[in-house]
Amino acid sequence: MSTRAPVELDFLGLRAAAADADDRHAKSGGSSASSSSSIRGMETSAIARIGPHLLRRVIAAAGPPPPPSTAPVPEEMPGAAAAAAPMTLFYNGSVAVFDVSHDKAEAIMRMATEATKAKGLARGNAIVGNFAKEPLTRTKSLQRFLSKRKERLTSLGPYQVGGPAAVGATTSTTTKSFLAKEEEHTAS
């Protein structure tokens, strides 16, 4: 396995100062909990407070777990296990690239899958669960909108006797005051 240091890229430039401080602390052996505990002044969750240097150390030190006894072991090509390839991880707003072997990459992905299943965060179930009741909600919303629209159209004001087209029309009867109309009506 290669002894190359992992590369971390911050494409948005949000953590440039924090990354410099993390690198300085990692080289000196100090901790950088204060610089990685907030992003632009916002407090983050306890899981997100894990520093990138700590994540690198955990991944580099962890070996692949033993394969399950019931699963068939895939045939490996000679020399394939020794070759390391770059693996990119997106975590806490940063991108980290590690040179890991194929076995270690599979172990990391298997561990992430098991953690996701244990917490019930399956991608398909969340999407189906959220949108299962949407057509009924849409129907109720549409019915509410149509009933309010009907009420607005049927409850035209007393000065819109001729309908919506008569609102813009100006005649001699519409420009007179209320008292003048009343006098005309009683005189007739």
Swiss-Prot record:
Residues 80-114 form the Tify domain. Keywords: Jasmonic acid signaling pathway, Transcription, Transcription regulation, Ubl conjugation. Induction: By jasmonate, wounding, and cold, drought and salt stresses. Down-regulated by abscisic acid (ABA). The keyword Transcription regulation applies. InterPro entries: CCT_CS (IPR018467), TIFY/JAZ (IPR040390), Tify_dom (IPR010399). Residues 179-188 have a biased composition (Basic and acidic residues). Ubiquitinated. Targeted for degradation by the SCF(COI1) E3 ubiquitin ligase-proteasome pathway during jasmonate signaling. GO terms for biological process: regulation of defense response; regulation of jasmonic acid mediated signaling pathway; response to wounding. It holds the Pfam family tify. A motif (Jas) lies at residues 135-160. GO terms for cellular component: nucleus. Residues 20-41, 156-188 are annotated as: Disordered. Residues 28-38 have a biased composition (Low complexity). It comes from the Eukaryota. Belongs to the TIFY/JAZ family. The jas domain (135-160) is required for interaction with COI1. Repressor of jasmonate responses. Interacts with COI1A and COI2 in a coronatine-dependent manner. Coronatine is an analog of jasmonoyl isoleucine (JA-Ile). This is Protein TIFY 9.
